[in-house]
């Protein structure tokens, strides 16, 4: 009789340990970048988000409105601002090359810069940002993000979890599912080591590119930027028009 009781106690103890381990709070804080007017996208994100993981909402500025875009004119390279104005006034105008952007992209850029400032002000060590058309389809995403922190510790600046395109650094290949990159496109979801990024923040200015492709500049200055494919956990909802006005 004693043996079965002991077995039950052991099983209960193991179960408690497993549950305790799986419920361990992540070492990072999450942020959601959205617009006040993007209620549907925001609510869809929140419907799929685990509320036990700390989340702060960043409401960006809608710079598709010229009066809002003008606030940032002084931190944008003049030629890029002029081209953005041309795109605003002429629907048939094309961009000189892929680094040029429309007015709406300015607000997106500054929303990501607001993310950095909040992380610095709150003395966070690690932080993750989601854009509001991300849909979390598998709760493993939180563990996958924590795994990057567990593996890299202080030895990285950023890790992207979604991309449209990238240029791998084949000389720094890893077997852990992490891929170091020299260039990457898309800022839908990424992790930063806050302290390590402090020295790179100034290099985001002046604005002369889209925020995602601007990371090429900090990579050239030594930032260790990685990519981890989390498409099995994340889905990008493209059923609605771009909130920055891109086609």
Go through the PLM ranges and name each one.
Residues 5-130, 134-247:
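An acidic/histidine-cluster motif and surrounding catalytic segment
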